[in-house]
Regions:
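Basic, Lys/Arg- and aromatic-enriched nucleic-acid-binding interface segment
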Residues: 76-116
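Conserved tyrosine-mediated DNA breakage-rejoining catalytic core shared by Y-recombinases
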Residues: 42, 46, 121-172
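C-terminal secondary-structure termini that scaffold catalytic or DNA-interacting sites
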Residues: 278-292
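C-terminal catalytic core of Y-nucleophile DNA break-rejoin enzymes
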Residues: 150-174, 190-212
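N-terminal core-binding DNA-recognition domain of tyrosine recombinases/integrases
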Residues: 1-62, 84-94
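Short, basic (Lys/Arg/His-rich) helix/loop patches that form interaction surfaces
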Residues: 91-92, 201, 209-250, 254
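Catalytic-site neighborhood detector that most strongly recognizes the C-terminal catalytic loop/helix
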Residues: 252, 256-279
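Short, charged phosphate-coordinating catalytic segments
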Residues: 28-34, 109-138, 246
Length: 292
């Protein structure tokens, strides 16, 4: 079909289409069986069976570099990032402050579901209060002013609310702003950028990538993953936290829900939880008895 091989998910989509057509044309409620026998002397039949169907080899079959991380992988990534900073500091080597900044940046990307450019283009003025979450101070919401543009248009803007499951980011950012950012550079106070270098300039996208790769490799996580996988993780985990689809779509700045759906790769545990909930709703106490 070309130089670029088809993805497993694409092939499965083709398979499902053909399988559904075969189910339709072989359905005894319709006259297609007898009509085909009369016209072609042969009856149609289902061509896909368990032994020749594409099997699920993984929970997520999209771009491997951007698959969502599990909760354990996210924790391992953050622990590794913190560990890198601790090791540099214990050896009294240069770069400890930068490593602490990098760990905070990765946590920010995940906690707000940000793209790479959106992250490095954040300014101090983009941190906002949320009247419904006063205890988070100025970390209740985040203004994204450099979102992905559509067809050459201007950058899209959105406000990302801090969800309760991510409230820990307020402590991370407080420590970064009060202790880490001032220690990076004497000129950081004159910069409007949230994420700065030791020269007081805005951190680059490349530096953000390198921060992720260093933590990823230290954590022993799949080396094919890139920084954008944290955004996919955010979407997937909000789904597993039972947030409405429309809310998630607004949080990540997608124009279409179909785009948000591509990001999702929920765990088997979540699927089982949904199934159990549905069975309880449908069968009530009868399901409890059957389960025992």
């Amino acid at each position: 079909s070309g130089a670029k091989p088809l993805r497993v998910s694409t092939l499965r989509g083709y398979e499902i289409d053909i399988k559904m057509f075969c189910e339709y044309i072989t359905d005894p409620r319709y006259p297609w069986l007898s009509e085909c026998e009369a016209r072609f002397s042969v009856a149609p039949r289902q061509v896909f069976h368990e032994d020749n169907s594409i099997v699920h080899v993984s929970e997520y079959e999209g771009d491997a570099a951007r698959r969502p991380l599990t909760f354990d992988e996210v924790q391992a990534l953050f622990d590794a990032a913190d560990g890198l900073a601790a090791r540099i500091r214990s050896r009294r080597r240069k770069g400890a402050v930068q490593a602490i900044r990098d760990a905070a940046l990765l946590k920010c990307v995940y906690a707000f579901g940000l793209r790479r450019r959106e992250t490095v283009m954040l300014d101090l003025v983009d941190l906002h209060r949320n009247a419904k979450l006063p205890h988070l101070d100025r970390f209740g919401a985040l203004s994204v002013r450099h979102g992905k543009a559509s067809r050459g248009g201007p950058s899209k803007r959105r406000t990302v609310l801090t969800v309760p499951e991510m409230e820990w980011i307020s402590e991370t950012l407080t420590h970064y702003l009060e202790e880490v950012r001032p220690a990076l550079s004497s000129s950081s106070g004159s910069s409007s950028a949230l994420w700065v270098t030791e020269r007081g300039t805005r951190l680059s996208r490349r530096a953000a990538n390198e921060a992720f790769c260093a933590a990823r490799d230290a954590a022993g996580i799949d080396s094919s993953l890139d920084l954008h996988s944290l955004r996919h993780s955010y979407v997937t985990h909000l789904v597993e936290f039972d947030y409405p689809e429309r809310f998630i779509q607004e949080q990540v700045g997608h124009s279409f829900s179909s785009t948000t759906a591509i990001y999702v790769g929920v765990s088997n545990e979540y699927r089982n939880r949904l199934l159990t909930r549905a069975l309880h709703t449908r069968y009530g106490s009868d399901f409890e008895g059957a389960a025992r």
